């Protein structure tokens, strides 16, 4: 699930030398070769363009459910109604959920397509997955520990997804980022297309290619993540939260959509597939918003401001205030509003975590609890995210692990709700 968005954190160190060379090789080596009307009405009543709502009121006799669509429409300065980013992303969610539901239906036995074009040595796939696990352990220790409770197939698949996402992220955030161009990302996307058709370029690609032959994973979230990297190359400001939401989906929400088919839904869950995907998306958005709020000063030093420009203006703040990095009452008030929004996304995500397969819940809960604590640390720093970097200490991380494990044993929320 979106807990794997730990890989998107700007705080993570660079890749090992070997993996960094892989990122640089992209440029050199690769160059060689809408819902029904009734629901719309309720959505307009409950939701705003500024803050996420926690769900849609259930109709009589229905189980309460969450929805990621906080406003299905937004209005331009000219007064024209356009589809919001939330609605666009929700359309992707529906597609992913439909794919998983088709996969869960009884199917005639077929032999999966295994990557053939890569000349792997004997036990090559085993070695490829092992290397993916090593990378995950090195850069996301807490999450890696949680994956050890999963079945072997699921564990290895999550490692493979993690590594692809990390390599993609390193293209624009890693040591070779200054050499990456839009055409390099185009070549990376071509390489993605190849591995989805069983033609991986290297050992790490082969692990992901094998994974997608075993699970109903769609290529769209992967393409969308690459689009997020393109956005980082050309865009340094976001006019409003609608724009920022789309960016957060591209670089973090996508990971949740990639991961749900692997992590699986608990057989006893009464939640809809769509609601589980929606919660995975919400966790990705929450984690990325947390990254943004933690890294305001660091991003400003790179000339980037990942904050809604219209909300900054409403708070009486400007880009100059961000670059000056002085904590004022205006800044504190603005940050309280941003933190509130991020917490609302975390709250929406919580219900969905309980619906996952029990063996998959621990790493997701661990990520959720640890990332949410970063918001507490920002508050503890008196909202100084210009010169102080909020982080969760080792002691708090260790304390969070048993709490996360305990929550992973809880009955799915949908089952508890249906018994009331």
Curated annotation (Swiss-Prot):
Expressed in leaves. Highly expressed in developing leaves. Expressed at low levels in roots. One of its GO terms (cellular component) is chloroplast membrane. GO terms for molecular function: 15-cis-phytoene synthase activity; geranylgeranyl diphosphate synthase activity; squalene synthase [NAD(P)H] activity. The keyword RNA-binding does not apply. GO terms for biological process: carotenoid biosynthetic process. The keyword Transferase applies. Residues 1-70 form a transit peptide. CDD domains: Trans_IPPS_HH. It is a peripheral membrane protein. Pfam families: SQS_PSY. Induction: Induced by salt stress and abscisic acid (ABA) in roots. It is found in: Plastid, Chloroplast membrane; Plastid, Chloroplast, Plastoglobule. Its EC number is 2.5.1.32. Keywords: Carotenoid biosynthesis, Chloroplast, Isoprene biosynthesis, Membrane, Plastid, Transferase, Transit peptide. It catalyses: 2 (2E,6E,10E)-geranylgeranyl diphosphate = 15-cis-phytoene + 2 diphosphate. Belongs to the phytoene/squalene synthase family. PANTHER family: BIFUNCTIONAL LYCOPENE CYCLASE/PHYTOENE SYNTHASE. Catalyzes the conversion of geranylgeranyl diphosphate to phytoene. Mediates the first committed step in carotenoid biosynthesis. This is Phytoene synthase 1, chloroplastic. It comes from Oryza sativa subsp. japonica (Rice).
């Amino acid at each position: 699930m979106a807990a794997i968005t730990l890989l998107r954190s700007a705080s993570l160190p660079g890749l090992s030398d070997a993996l960094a060379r892989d990122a640089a090789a992209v440029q050199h080596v690769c160059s060689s070769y809408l819902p029904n009307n009734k629901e719309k009405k309720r959505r307009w009543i409950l939701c705003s363009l500024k803050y996420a709502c926690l769900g849609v009121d259930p109709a009589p006799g229905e189980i309460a459910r969450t929805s990621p669509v906080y406003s299905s429409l937004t209005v331009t300065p000219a007064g024209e109604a356009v589809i919001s980013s939330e609605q666009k992303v929700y359309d992707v969610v529906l597609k992913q959920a439909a794919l998983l539901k088709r996969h869960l239906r009884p199917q005639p036995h077929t032999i999966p397509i295994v990557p053939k074009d890569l000349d792997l040595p004997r036990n090559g796939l085993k070695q490829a997955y092992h290397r993916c696990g090593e990378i995950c352990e090195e850069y996301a220790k807490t999450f890696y520990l949680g994956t050890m409770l999963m079945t072997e197939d699921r564990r290895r698949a999550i490692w493979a997804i993690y590594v692809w996402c990390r390599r993609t992220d390193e293209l624009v955030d890693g040591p070779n980022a200054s050499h990456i161009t839009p055409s390099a990302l185009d070549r990376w996307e071509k390489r993605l297309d190849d591995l989805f058709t069983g033609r991986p370029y290297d050992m790490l690609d082969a692990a992901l290619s094998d994974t997608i032959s075993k699970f109903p994973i769609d290529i769209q979230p992967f393409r969308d993540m690459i689009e997020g990297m393109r956005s980082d190359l050309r865009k340094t400001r976001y006019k409003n939260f609608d724009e920022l939401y789309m960016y957060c989906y591209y670089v973090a929400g996508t990971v949740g959509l990639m991961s749900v088919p692997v992590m699986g839904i608990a057989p006893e869950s009464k939640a809809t597939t769509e609601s589980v995907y929606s919660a995975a998306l919400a966790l990705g958005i929450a984690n990325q918003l947390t990254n943004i709020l933690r890294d305001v000063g660091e991003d400003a030093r790179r000339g980037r401001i990942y904050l809604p420009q219209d909300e900054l203006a409403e708070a009486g703040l400007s880009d100059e205030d961000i670059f000056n990095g002085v904590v004022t009452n205006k800044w504190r008030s603005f940050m309280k509003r941003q933190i509130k929004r991020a917490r609302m996304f975390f709250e929406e995500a919580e219900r969905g975590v309980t619906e996952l397969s029990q063996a998959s819940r621990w790493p997701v809960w661990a990520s959720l609890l640890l990332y949410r604590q970063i918001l507490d640390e920002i508050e503890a720093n008196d909202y100084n995210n210009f010169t102080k970097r909020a982080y969760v200490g080792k002691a708090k991380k260790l304390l969070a692990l048993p709490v996360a494990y305990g929550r992973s044993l809880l009955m799915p929320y949908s089952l508890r709700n249906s018994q009331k």
